């Protein structure tokens, strides 16, 4: 998942989306 889609991708989880080297991470 790209950075721009990260917030939507992580939505619904108690996540704080971060972007590392163009990769989306949902940090719970």
From Swiss-Prot:
Give the organism's phylogenetic lineage.
Answer: Eukaryota, Metazoa, Ecdysozoa, Arthropoda, Chelicerata
InterPro entries in the record, alphabetically? Scorpion_toxin-like_sf (IPR036574), Toxin_alpha-KTx_8/9 (IPR008911)
Would I find Disulfide bond among this entry's keywords? yes
Q: What does this protein do?
A: Inhibits voltage-gated potassium channels.
State which residue ranges cross the membrane: none
Mind listing the GO molecular function terms for this protein? ion channel inhibitor activity; toxin activity
Where it sits in the cell: the answer is: Secreted
Q: GO CC terms on record?
A: extracellular region
Q: Keyword set for this entry?
A: Disulfide bond, Secreted, Toxin
Tissue specificity as recorded in UniProt? Expressed by the venom gland.
**Family, as annotated:** Belongs to the short scorpion toxin superfamily. Potassium channel inhibitor family. Alpha-KTx 09 subfamily.
Q: What is this protein called?
A: Potassium channel toxin alpha-KTx 9.3
One Pfam family of this protein, by short name?
A: Toxin_6
List where this protein forms a coiled coil: none
Write out the domain note: Has the structural arrangement of an alpha-helix connected to a beta-sheet by disulfide bonds.
Cysteine pairings via disulfide bonds? 3-19, 6-24, 10-26
